[in-house]
């Protein structure tokens, strides 16, 4: 049964996988939670090599300088699987853990925000001298569908990938 087929109450009360399961079974294995009540994806082509796009994404401490809504970001070490990081998005504190760190091709993490659990993936693919960037995210947990909407998440992903494109093309 798809999220759209579930009743309002079913979407509102969706608990979904534990954070550990989301991290180990979903994010590390190339997927978001397709059953989550909040899902979105966005794709953009950036006129810059994937190495330059990667440098922007992987430098989490610099996110506040170019990612809309991010005011603080701190990584506890070098980017690597299972390394935690904390950041502030639109005034809300997010606790995240990197799941996949494949230079030039994928940066994925799991995180918690206001009682919700999310999986976020950035996928980079070379495309004739440019880079195709796909961003996808799922947000689940009790009341996630009431606190947030797929449309709102779609707008956030579009803003983020748009800023990534602008920043990478400016430096590239």
Task: List where the protein language model places each region.
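Glycine-rich portal/gate segments that line the openings of hydrophobic small-molecule binding cavities
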Residues: 8-14, 45, 64-65, 74-119, ...
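A conserved amphipathic terminal alpha-helix motif
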Residues: 10-25, 132, 138-172
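Short, conserved loop/turn and helix-capping segments at secondary-structure boundaries
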Residues: 57, 114, 150-154
């Amino acid at each position: 049964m798809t999220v759209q087929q579930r009743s309002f109450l079913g979407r509102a009360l969706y608990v979904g996988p534990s954070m550990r399961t989301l991290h180990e079974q979903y994010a590390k294995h190339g997927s978001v939670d397709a059953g989550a009540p909040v899902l979105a994806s966005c794709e953009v082509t950036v006129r810059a090599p994937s190495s330059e796009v990667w440098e922007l994404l992987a430098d989490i401490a610099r996110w506040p300088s170019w990612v809309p809504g991010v005011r603080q970001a701190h990584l506890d070490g070098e980017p690597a699987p299972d390394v935690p990081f904390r950041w502030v998005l639109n005034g809300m504190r997010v606790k995240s853990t990197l799941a996949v760190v494949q230079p030039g091709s994928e940066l994925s993490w799991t995180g918690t925000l206001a009682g919700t659990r999310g999986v976020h993936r950035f996928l980079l693919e070379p495309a004739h001298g440019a880079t195709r960037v796909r961003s996808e995210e799922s947000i689940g947990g009790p009341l996630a569908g009431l606190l947030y909407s797929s449309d709102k998440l779609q707008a956030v992903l579009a803003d983020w990938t748009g800023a990534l494109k602008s920043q990478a093309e400016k430096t590239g």
